[in-house]
Amino acid sequence: MREILFRGQSIDRREWYEGDLYQSRLKSVFFISYYTEYGDRMSVGVDSKTVGQYTGLLDKNGNKIFEGDILKQKTTPEFAKVNSFEWEHYGIVRFGYYDWDEGEAGYASIGWYIEPLKSVSIKPKNYLVGHIQAGLNQSDILNKYYPMEIIGNIHDNPELLKGGGEE
């Protein structure tokens, strides 16, 4: 079963907190409730625009992947051997409806997915690379052939929204 966890940026100090999410009765303030290193339960007011839910997945470095994170995916050597090309994809972790390959072979789903920002051909340089819009329910395949790495998030790194990482 997936761990239900939220992340939000505190209103006052702009620091990130992870824990349970709740809202004031007046619905004007969101709070993240968390445990300190000493086991005390604390709550902090967070900016509602920064709240994102944990996907239940980890990136290749063991970091928790949250809604709003920006991911880099690069083909593995194993993939490159079989397919004779390499590429990188950059995208935003989202939750909602997505339509993968709208033709008869495609499918539509509701869940975690990666919204494409940019795709870059590494080898050969001029290879035409399409965007990958994948559901995170395919994480076993994604991690085997193009592992995910968090390179930032939409709140702290808006410059990455212009197309992912460096050229």
Question: Positions of the model-derived regions?
Answer:
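Secondary-structure transition motif
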Residues: 1-167
